[in-house]
Amino acid sequence: MELTSFHRSSLLFLISLTLIILPTTTTSIGVNYGQIGDNLPSPTDVIPLIKSIGATKVKLYDANPQILKAFSNTGIEFIIGLGNEYLSKMKDPSKALTWIKQNVTPFLPATNITCITIGNEILALNDSSLTTNLLPAMQGVHSALITAGLSDQISVTTAHSLSILKSSFPPSAGEFQPDLLDSLTPILEFHRKTDSPFLINAYPFFAYKGNPKEVPLDFVLFQPNQGIVDPATGFHYDNMLFAQIDAVYSALAAAGFKSLRVEISETGWPSKGDDDEVGATPENAKRYNGNLIKMMMSGKKTKTPLKPNNDLSIYVFALFNENLKPGPTSERNYGLFKPDGTQAYSLGFALNDVVRGASGGGTGGGNSSSGGGRDKSPVFPVSPVAPDSASTGYLAISASPVTGKRKGKGAILSLVVSMLLARHLL
């Protein structure tokens, strides 16, 4: 009996110790890995860069086989994508199954693929054909995953622009555009039925760019500020991104889908822009992305006021500066890294030894606004990898619209929201 009692006591002690040691948060940071460049490093060389910023998740805009193979047995979680041009084909479950067998199954289970996005910001494009095909394509891919026995492992979703909101201030008054509800509601029902995440691309940068005199810079950069209070809930917000996220949650609740979980599929800040792209500087990019990553990784602030029990899932845009992306200068300068593996700017914290040692930054150079005297030698020899046919879909679904209409539409909404936010600063 004494031995049994001893074992019981020891077991209770170990359980208690485990509860103390194990982290209580499941929050992690992800990064968007775009490939629109002719000077990008090989996927194998990319792995240490992703790990150096603490990212455990990667979002692709395609299903590039070279990348998926290179990341096998790394444990890094992947979202892969089907471009807008695939929507009409994916309506057919048999064609979707063929795509799954060619682009997903060969890499499992070594590569941790957990989600497939169907198109990007479709409802903001005002394209009736794409809008009509979106849900059937999502259903077709989900049906194919069921047939392949992968539906429990891999979810299906699509990413939306923040412009699908009619109102977003105060956050409690978040509401979807009425003219989108006929298309959006069945998609939300699909999410509820399949337990897949609702993805939003959110860029506070455009709010500041649109009206830098009215929008408090500290509020959008996660810097210390007085913040705002939602008069309906009493919740305090000290950054715009969290206010935007809760506005989306409020819109979902108003539409009858309170239980859906929101993930931020894109957010970021460019380090360079054209003359009219106010705020696109290395210092602001450092503060936005650096503060966001530090905040998420520290676990100190990983939930929004409206959803205190929901850990955030956020994907930073983007991993590299991509020299072949169309659009304004900023579109080619969202990267955390240059193609040679050096930092595009300091993030304000030390990276791991792989990058820190190669760049010569140490911990001392990590706090300079633009890298200071940091050694600019490449982390690894650049072996240009031009985008192949598997990557061309990214041109159609990247954060950079060729026409500029999509982000312009989102920027107008963000501007209205930000002006209201500025007027309510305490």
From Swiss-Prot:
<keyword id="KW-0378">Hydrolase</keyword>
<dbReference type="InterPro" id="IPR044965">
    <property type="entry name" value="Glyco_hydro_17_plant"/>
</dbReference>
<keyword id="KW-0326">Glycosidase</keyword>
<feature type="signal peptide">
    <location>
        <begin position="1"/>
        <end position="30"/>
    </location>
</feature>
<keyword id="KW-0961">Cell wall biogenesis/degradation</keyword>
<keyword id="KW-0134">Cell wall</keyword>
<dbReference type="GO" id="GO:0005975">
    <property type="term" value="P:carbohydrate metabolic process"/>
</dbReference>
<keyword id="KW-1003">Cell membrane</keyword>
<dbReference type="GO" id="GO:0042973">
    <property type="term" value="F:glucan endo-1,3-beta-D-glucosidase activity"/>
</dbReference>
<keyword id="KW-0472">Membrane</keyword>
<dbReference type="Pfam" id="PF00332">
    <property type="entry name" value="Glyco_hydro_17"/>
</dbReference>
<protein>
    <recommendedName>
        <fullName>Glucan endo-1,3-beta-glucosidase 11</fullName>
        <ecNumber>3.2.1.39</ecNumber>
    </recommendedName>
</protein>
<dbReference type="GO" id="GO:0005576">
    <property type="term" value="C:extracellular region"/>
</dbReference>
<comment type="similarity">
    <text>Belongs to the glycosyl hydrolase 17 family.</text>
</comment>
<dbReference type="InterPro" id="IPR000490">
    <property type="entry name" value="Glyco_hydro_17"/>
</dbReference>
<feature type="propeptide" description="Removed in mature form">
    <location>
        <begin position="399"/>
        <end position="426"/>
    </location>
</feature>
<keyword id="KW-0611">Plant defense</keyword>
<feature type="active site" description="Nucleophile">
    <location>
        <position position="266"/>
    </location>
</feature>
<feature type="glycosylation site" description="N-linked (GlcNAc...) asparagine">
    <location>
        <position position="112"/>
    </location>
</feature>
<feature type="active site" description="Proton donor">
    <location>
        <position position="121"/>
    </location>
</feature>
<feature type="glycosylation site" description="N-linked (GlcNAc...) asparagine">
    <location>
        <position position="126"/>
    </location>
</feature>
<dbReference type="InterPro" id="IPR017853">
    <property type="entry name" value="Glycoside_hydrolase_SF"/>
</dbReference>
<dbReference type="GO" id="GO:0006952">
    <property type="term" value="P:defense response"/>
</dbReference>
<keyword id="KW-0732">Signal</keyword>
<keyword id="KW-0325">Glycoprotein</keyword>
<feature type="glycosylation site" description="N-linked (GlcNAc...) asparagine">
    <location>
        <position position="367"/>
    </location>
</feature>
<keyword id="KW-0449">Lipoprotein</keyword>
<dbReference type="GO" id="GO:0071555">
    <property type="term" value="P:cell wall organization"/>
</dbReference>
<feature type="compositionally biased region" description="Gly residues">
    <location>
        <begin position="360"/>
        <end position="372"/>
    </location>
</feature>
<feature type="region of interest" description="Disordered">
    <location>
        <begin position="360"/>
        <end position="389"/>
    </location>
</feature>
<dbReference type="GO" id="GO:0098552">
    <property type="term" value="C:side of membrane"/>
</dbReference>
<feature type="lipid moiety-binding region" description="GPI-anchor amidated serine">
    <location>
        <position position="398"/>
    </location>
</feature>
<keyword id="KW-0336">GPI-anchor</keyword>
<dbReference type="GO" id="GO:0005886">
    <property type="term" value="C:plasma membrane"/>
</dbReference>
<keyword id="KW-0964">Secreted</keyword>
